[in-house]
Structure formats: structure tokens, C-alpha cells
């Protein structure tokens, strides 16, 4: 059994026991979150596609970690002008473990 869920503007294909990194969610570590935007569910070889979401379906996941991704360095410069700018960005993320799919 698997499901396609949407969170943080991205879509993920998940099964029970999967570990995935999603855009930051406001949840405490070791708490459970419900992902209610389930776009599709495959149960017993039968695919149910929502329009736009599957009614009554949800995915329950446990928050394992809140963290930041590796730093992305942005360096801008203009040649011959002595103009340089160096910026860095670390995107926050939430690490989830899928516990169950309810459909």
C-alpha cells in the first residue's frame, strides 16, 4: 500500500516505514503529524485518485528531527568594478517517518 501526499508545495510517494525530508513543519520532535492532502492511494493493487484529494484519507507520520540542509553559497560579482557579494542560505527541513496510511 502506498500513497501520494502533498506538503510544502511538493509531492511524495510514501509507504509505511519510509523516512523522508520535507519542508519545515511546525511540530515538536517525537510528535505525530497528519498529512491530509492525499492525492492518490494504492490499496490492494487498486489505485484511487482524488479530485483533487482523496476524501477521508490521511497519512500519519512521526517527526524524527528538525534541522537545516547544507549551506548553499551564492556569490555575485561584477567584473572590473570591485563589486562582490557573498551570501549563504540553509533551508530548514523536517525529517518524518511514515507510521500508517489511513484510507
UniProtKB/Swiss-Prot annotation:
Lineage top rank: taxon: Bacteria
Keyword set for this entry?
Answer: Ribonucleoprotein, Ribosomal protein, RNA-binding, rRNA-binding
A single Pfam family it belongs to is Ribosomal_L21p
PROSITE patterns registered for this protein in UniProt: RIBOSOMAL_L21
Q: Name one GO cellular component term.
A: cytoplasm
Disordered: annotated span = 80-103
| InterPro entries to which the protein is assigned, alphabetical | bL21-like, bL21-like_sf, Ribosomal_bL21, Ribosomal_bL21_CS
One biological process term from GO is:
translation
Q: Name one GO molecular function term.
A: rRNA binding
Which regions are flagged for Basic residues bias? 80-89
- NCBIfam families reported in the protein's UniProt record: L21
Q: What does this protein do?
A: This protein binds to 23S rRNA in the presence of protein L20.
- Membership in a protein family: Belongs to the bacterial ribosomal protein bL21 family.
Subunit info here reads: Part of the 50S ribosomal subunit. Contacts protein L20.
PANTHER family associated with the record? 50S RIBOSOMAL PROTEIN L21, LARGE RIBOSOMAL SUBUNIT PROTEIN BL21M
Name-wise, this protein is: Large ribosomal subunit protein bL21
Q: Which organism is it from?
A: Clostridium novyi (strain NT)
Lineage, broadest ranks: Bacteria, Bacillati, Bacillota, Clostridia, Eubacteriales
Instruction: Please name the gene that encodes this protein.
Output: rplU
